[in-house]
């Protein structure tokens, strides 16, 4: 008996149900692999220090090595053999996926040729989304995560040291405003084309904690399906290394309040750029 072909909407819904970073149930049963092929970044967040040869820290922006597209495909093949529940291949750094887009696109194209069913996702700060949305869609990427930390340029100016756009460095409110404009237009277009968008929000006590609900409202209006409000990681060497944190109970209360606007993610592990396995059990050191 011929299997009924899924509608595009049902197809994406099925992939979402198998994506550990978009579905809580999938976080327990499905595995993902992050392929660290994107070393460049076009903004400098005051909470970020990227590391390309680190084996100890567990946070975004960190990888033990940056891979070429060919090396990334080899790693994917090994992971696919070793992890039966591998359903997602993503590009999440260690820089920004769209600042090193050629490497990411080549990687995903090669993987698609050997695995037509794998779900593709990528994470980005959103600065270059208006330039690459059609390319992202043509690659078969169904899930995109955009980090939006402020919808007020006066606040964004405190979070971003600078934004480098089309070869020019922008600072202060100018840079924050440019970034926000591109983030929102990119989210709006991706959502209109059926791509599932999740927005990550790094909550920074005393800086953007007063506008979290406003961020959630605004990205909802652009078509975002879920938001992930995350605790700041005070990285040594960053401008925010001494920043105080809110309590976990306060964090969960903010998430609970924002659930009235959009579904919230509670199970994020703030993974490395080379994470592999389920959210509970990283298998990179067992496979690589």
Where are these regions (language model features)?
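C-terminal accessory region of radical SAM enzymes
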Residues: 194, 245-280
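Short glycine-centered, acidic/aromatic-flanked micro-motifs in structured strand/loop junctions
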Residues: 91-94, 201-203, 255
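Flexible glycine/acidic-rich beta-alpha junction loops that bind and position SAM and/or redox cofactors
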Residues: 154-161, 206-209, 226-246, 271-283
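Short glycine-enriched, charge-decorated loop/helix-capping segments at active-site entrances
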Residues: 59-64, 160-163, 172-173, 241-245
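Active-site mouth loops of central-metabolism enzymes
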Residues: 61-69, 204-209
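Conserved AdoMet/S-adenosylmethionine-binding subsite of the radical SAM
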Residues: 97-230
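N-terminal [4Fe-4S]-dependent radical SAM core
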Residues: 1-36, 41, 50-66, 78, ...
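Short Fe-S-cluster ligation motifs
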Residues: 71-92
């Amino acid at each position: 008996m011929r299997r009924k072909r899924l509608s595009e909407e049902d197809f994406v819904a099925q992939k979402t149900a198998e994506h550990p970073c978009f579905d809580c149930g999938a976080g327990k049963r499905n595995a993902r692999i992050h392929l660290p092929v994107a070393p460049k970044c076009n903004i400098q967040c005051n909470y970020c220090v990227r590391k390309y040869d680190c084996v100890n820290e567990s946070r975004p922006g960190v990888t033990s090595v940056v891979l070429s597209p060919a090396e990334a495909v080899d790693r994917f093949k090994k992971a696919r053999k070793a992890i039966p529940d591998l359903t997602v291949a993503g590009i999440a750094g260690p820089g920004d996926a769209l600042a090193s887009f050629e490497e990411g696109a080549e990687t995903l194209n090669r993987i698609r040729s050997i695995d037509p069913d794998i779900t593709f996702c990528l994470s980005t700060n959103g600065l270059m989304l208006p330039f690459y949305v059609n390319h992202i869609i043509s690659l078969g990427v169904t899930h995109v995560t955009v980090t939006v930390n402020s919808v007020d340029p006066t606040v964004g100016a405190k979070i971003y040291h600078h934004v480098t756009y089309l070869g020019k460095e922008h600072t202060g409110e100018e840079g924050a405003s440019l970034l926000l404009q591109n983030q929102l237009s990119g989210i709006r277009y991706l959502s209109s084309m059926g791509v599932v968008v999740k927005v990550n929000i790094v909550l920074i006590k005393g800086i953007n904690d007063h506008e979290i609900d406003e961020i959630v409202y605004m990205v909802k209006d652009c078509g975002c399906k879920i938001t992930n409000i995350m605790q700041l990681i005070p990285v040594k060497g960053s401008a925010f290394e001494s920043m105080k944190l809110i309590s976990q109970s306060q964090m969960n209360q903010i998430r609970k309040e924002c659930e009235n606007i959009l579904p919230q993610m509670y199970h994020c592990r703030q993974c490395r750029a080379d994470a592999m396995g389920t959210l509970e059990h990283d298998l990179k050191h067992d496979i690589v």
